[in-house]
Amino acid sequence: MSTFLGFPRRRPADDEEPFGPLPHPREPLRWGDPFPVAAKTALANTQLRRNLARATTTIRDKRARVVDEVPDWEALRDAGSAVKAQVLADLPALLARLEESVTARGGVVHWARDAAEANAIVAGIVTAKGVDEVVKVKSMATQEIGLNEALAEHGVAAVETDLAELIVQLADDMPSHFLVPAIHRNRREIRDIFLARMADAPPDLTDAPRELATAARAHLRRKFLTTKVAISGANFAAADTGTIGVVESEGNGRMCLTLPETLVTVMGIEKLVPRFEDLEVFLQLLPRSATGERMNPYTSLWTGVTPGDGPQEFHLVLLDNGRTKVLADEAGRAALHCIRCSACLNVCPVYEQVGGHAYGSVYPGPIGAILTPQLTGPSGTAGGGHRDPNAALPFASTLCGACYDVCPVRIDIPSILVELRAREVDADRGRLDPTAAAMKVASWAMSDAARFTAAERVASWTHRLGGADHMVRRLPFPGSLWTRARDLPVPAPQSFRRWWAATHDPEEPS
């Protein structure tokens, strides 16, 4: 499911490639620079920051309006949270029930311990059909395992049919938002991408939204009508009936789920609901939280195989890929409640400034900051002696709590962030840490009256470094660690203790 907002990105320079790609990583859950480095790069792109602010504000406002229409919204959130808690508590039994239900209705269930197993299963199914192309419904699970790249190694092209995902794929880029994967692209870039990478794009294509959508529609229509295998993700799966559900906004999913002869669905094991009637709760929570709509334009549900109607071969791949490890963590398992609505991204002040690519994972934003490190686990040091880039993700937050306030299933993201931070700090004990070193220096100065007085005098001299607004903008190292990202207020020329001594009688009781 995606919403194409078409907000602009910065205009490329004349000597730049019109759509500079961000190549697909070898590890979709751990790639690129650590967050502090990537965030610094993103912060330098002021146009990107303005565009993200405009886009997230639009989605936030839409969500607020439709949520206000629901008098029992908080009760719905409680219900969604309770269902998800039940799923995690009974997950083994519910998965067995789902397998039984799907199998009884003509489907085939596969179990994948990790990305490699899942990719091998899907590649085996696809190559057995003798096809060299498949169509795909938008799926974060398949992005997580790098399925498109795995299929390419077997000579199979996976065509993304969601408009925004198609844009990202044609540009050899990475998505930067759950629902608006191409939020960092503007219309001019999209036109250039289509002309350069879409073989059947009209040569006179302009950047008018209607023309862009029409070109994509014609391109995809031919794929829908000729491709024999489709691959999808799943928003939900009802254990009692074996029914799988996909919600989307464009209709491409409906085409993929009905026209091809074979359908392969890759689903994280946490996407279960115990009963079909539980979908009532989530089909109210998800569209309002995600796209600010009262209901999804397209809600597709299918149960196994129906003779003469739709795909005649259905495979369900149940993906673990670190989820059972997260489930075993009492403090962090609530991250598996996530229904991928992206509401937390749209309210996060950090995401709004740096965008999705800075997180180095297909799961950006607040939920990505708690889910990605748990899925991948600590890796010690990466190649070249650098620390695992995911270790910094729990610190990519102001802990303002806005994500918790909007989460439709009440995931306490701030609390999990704090827990993951504590673990990272504990793992770092004994290493030279700038923050710890600064605290030791402060403790040394504050533990002795004479040293503290001397420190006050030194600090008072720095007021001369400030400008007319009494702010310091540049300091030498180690002060540059602060001033490279924010201004520093100058200390008062007179300390509080000196002011008190000058204005109060020492004999006067305080």
Annotate each PLM feature.
Residues 117, 296-308, 340, 351-355, ...:
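A glycine-rich phosphate-binding loop feature that marks nucleotide/adenosyl-phosphate handling sites
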Residues 2-331:
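The feature marks the mature, well-folded catalytic cores of soluble enzymes
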Residues 11-59, 69, 352, 393, ...:
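Intrinsic disorder at enzyme termini
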Residues 309-335, 345, 350-466, 471-472:
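Ferredoxin-type iron-sulfur electron-transfer modules in oxidoreductases and energy-metabolism complexes
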Residues 8-28, 200, 204, 377-389, ...:
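Intrinsically disordered, low-complexity coil segments
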Residues 271, 336-340:
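Short, contiguous, pocket-lining structural segments
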Residues 164, 294-298, 432-437, 470-476:
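Short coil/turn segments at secondary-structure boundaries
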